[in-house]
Structure formats: structure tokens, C-alpha cells
């Protein structure tokens, strides 16, 4: 079952990306290194509620 998640920047807290994940394969919160337009660099983005 895939669910929609929001990814927030760990440095500025801005929610920049919307993605989906499979809860069966990834039960924990996911982290991706993505581009943050506010910081103008690639930062770590974590799943938020």
C-alpha cells in the first residue's frame, strides 16, 4: 500500500517535495538528499507527517 508523504528540509524546515512510499518496505521515516531552493544547495530532506 503506497501512501503520500511530504519531504521537509532539515536545515530550513521548508516542505519542498511530495512523494509516495511503500509502508511495507519502508516502515521508518525516509531521508533523501535533495535540492532546497531556499538554501540554494542540496540538503537532507526527511519525511514529515
From Swiss-Prot:
Q: Which domain of life is it from?
A: Bacteria
Ordered alphabetically, the record's keywords are: Ribonucleoprotein, Ribosomal protein
According to the record, the residues making up region (Disordered) are 21-49
InterPro entries from the UniProt entry: Ribosomal_bL33, Ribosomal_bL33_CS, Ribosomal_bL33_sf, Ribosomal_zn-bd
Cite a GO CC annotation: ribosome
Keyword NAD listed? The answer is: no
Record-level Gene Ontology MF annotations: structural constituent of ribosome
Task: Give a Pfam family name.
Answer: Ribosomal_L33
Q: Which SUPFAM superfamilies match?
A: Zn-binding ribosomal proteins
Q: Which GO terms describe its biological process?
A: translation
Basic and acidic residues: compositionally biased ranges: 25-49
PANTHER family the UniProt entry points to:
50S RIBOSOMAL PROTEIN L33, CHLOROPLASTIC (PTHR43168), LARGE RIBOSOMAL SUBUNIT PROTEIN BL33C (PTHR43168:SF2)
The entry assigns this protein to a family as follows: Belongs to the bacterial ribosomal protein bL33 family.
Protein's recorded name: Large ribosomal subunit protein bL33C
**Source organism of this protein record:** Bacillus licheniformis (strain ATCC 14580 / DSM 13 / JCM 2505 / CCUG 7422 / NBRC 12200 / NCIMB 9375 / NCTC 10341 / NRRL NRS-1264 / Gibson 46)
Tell me the name of the encoding gene: rpmG3
